[in-house]
Structure formats: C-alpha cells, structure tokens
Amino acid sequence: MSDENDTPEELADISGVGPSKAEALAEAGFESVADVQAADQSELAEADGIGNALAARIKADVGGLEVEADTDAEVEEVGGDDEADTDADVETELRARGLTEKTPDLSEDEQRLLQKRRSVNTPQFNRQDYHKKKRTPTSWRRPKGTLSKQRRGIKGKGDTVEAGFRTPTAVRGKHPSGFEEVRVHNTDDLAGVDPDTEAARIASKVGARKRERIEEHAESQGIRVLNPTYVEVEVEDNE
C-alpha cells in the first residue's frame, strides 16, 4: 500500500514539477505520469523549461516505479514488452557536447613550439622545506637564507624559478590543444570569439541550463568549448 501511496497520480505531484512545468510537459506530449515513465531523459529535457537537470530529477522520481499487473496486461496487448527489452539492451556511453575534436589554425612554427612545450618537463617549483613542516605550503617562495642549499643551487634541493624555464612566447599561455582560452559567462560573450584561434571556457558559476544554451550557441558558431558537459547517448552498432 505504501508503494501505491508514493506513486504520483498527476504530473504536478512529481518531484520538481509544479503547475507551470506540468503544462510544459503536457504541451510537449507527456500528458500523464505513464508518458513520463516511458520517455527518455533526453526527450523530457527537450520540453520547454525542463532541461537536463530537472529531467534527471523527474526520471529519478518516476522512472523506477513498479508497474501494476493490469498495466502489464495492457502493455502486452500493445506489444510493449518487446520495446522494454529493447530499451534494456541498449548500450549507452558518456560523450561531450559540441566540437570536441576541432583544432586551431596554427602555423608550422607554432605547431613545432607547441610540441616542444609538451616534451619539456617543467619542475614543480615547490617552496623550500615544504615537506618538513605541515604548516609550510608548497606555493613557491624564493629562498633568501645565506646558508640555503636551494638558493645556492645544490643538486637535489629543488629548482628555483628562472627565465630559462619559460615556454616559447608564441605558445605561452595557450591551451594544450593550441587554442587561446576565452572565459565566457553567457552567449553574448561568444560574440568576440574567433573560432579559428580561440576556444571558450565556461565559467564555473554558470548553471546547467545556461551552460546548455552556451554550448548549443557555440556549436552553431563553430566554437569549441574546452570544458563541455558530458551527456549519456546510445551507442550505435555499425556491425
């Protein structure tokens, strides 16, 4: 009996769904709780004002509900068991949204310097004696003591920051892919991004819905996003 009482009877009874969201689901074709149960997360996310985060919450509340015996009989008449078996056998994987394989337009010299930067191991430049005292952080500070072995450059005492460790000027500060990073907070920030040489990095404070809009707009403009959202998609069998 407790399971029956926990089962949402109306769309507005679902966790995270109010009257306005229920109307949006109904307009998208999900007029009952059964329709929501049969839908995928991606299908629910396409409804106006739902998004991936709320779609996942809805599926968590509705997707695991047990189906009554009468409903099973009706589904068997329609042939729904075959569809359920098919859904259970579908393989999925996480894939990044957007143009993840896009590379920048670099000159031969920039490509050579970028490869050189990858092959050179830069020291960590830890603070002197950081491993001896717990209160000493690893952040770099130049040793100033007259007897400091690190200041005198004694082997094994750690490297000191010098100009010779800097990366080549042409590729300094660039992403490992070769793009110049541009921090964006909304779709308007993408207006000044050059898709051939620059890539967007979405700010960490941006929410899921706005992030999705930014990623869609960036893909339409041919701009690569360096920190894309990973979504679950079905794996197509090419055999």
From Swiss-Prot:
<keyword id="KW-0689">Ribosomal protein</keyword>
<dbReference type="InterPro" id="IPR018263">
    <property type="entry name" value="Ribosomal_eL32_CS"/>
</dbReference>
<feature type="compositionally biased region" description="Acidic residues">
    <location>
        <begin position="1"/>
        <end position="12"/>
    </location>
</feature>
<feature type="compositionally biased region" description="Basic and acidic residues">
    <location>
        <begin position="92"/>
        <end position="113"/>
    </location>
</feature>
<dbReference type="InterPro" id="IPR010995">
    <property type="entry name" value="DNA_repair_Rad51/TF_NusA_a-hlx"/>
</dbReference>
<keyword id="KW-0687">Ribonucleoprotein</keyword>
<feature type="compositionally biased region" description="Basic residues">
    <location>
        <begin position="130"/>
        <end position="155"/>
    </location>
</feature>
<dbReference type="GO" id="GO:0006412">
    <property type="term" value="P:translation"/>
</dbReference>
<dbReference type="GO" id="GO:0003735">
    <property type="term" value="F:structural constituent of ribosome"/>
</dbReference>
<protein>
    <recommendedName>
        <fullName>Large ribosomal subunit protein eL32</fullName>
    </recommendedName>
</protein>
<comment type="similarity">
    <text>Belongs to the eukaryotic ribosomal protein eL32 family.</text>
</comment>
<feature type="compositionally biased region" description="Acidic residues">
    <location>
        <begin position="67"/>
        <end position="91"/>
    </location>
</feature>
<dbReference type="InterPro" id="IPR003583">
    <property type="entry name" value="Hlx-hairpin-Hlx_DNA-bd_motif"/>
</dbReference>
<dbReference type="Pfam" id="PF14520">
    <property type="entry name" value="HHH_5"/>
</dbReference>
<dbReference type="InterPro" id="IPR023654">
    <property type="entry name" value="Ribosomal_eL32_arc"/>
</dbReference>
<dbReference type="GO" id="GO:0006281">
    <property type="term" value="P:DNA repair"/>
</dbReference>
<dbReference type="GO" id="GO:0003677">
    <property type="term" value="F:DNA binding"/>
</dbReference>
<dbReference type="GO" id="GO:0022625">
    <property type="term" value="C:cytosolic large ribosomal subunit"/>
</dbReference>
<dbReference type="GO" id="GO:0000166">
    <property type="term" value="F:nucleotide binding"/>
</dbReference>
<dbReference type="Pfam" id="PF01655">
    <property type="entry name" value="Ribosomal_L32e"/>
</dbReference>
<feature type="region of interest" description="Disordered">
    <location>
        <begin position="1"/>
        <end position="23"/>
    </location>
</feature>
<dbReference type="InterPro" id="IPR036351">
    <property type="entry name" value="Ribosomal_eL32_sf"/>
</dbReference>
<feature type="region of interest" description="Disordered">
    <location>
        <begin position="64"/>
        <end position="178"/>
    </location>
</feature>
<dbReference type="InterPro" id="IPR001515">
    <property type="entry name" value="Ribosomal_eL32"/>
</dbReference>
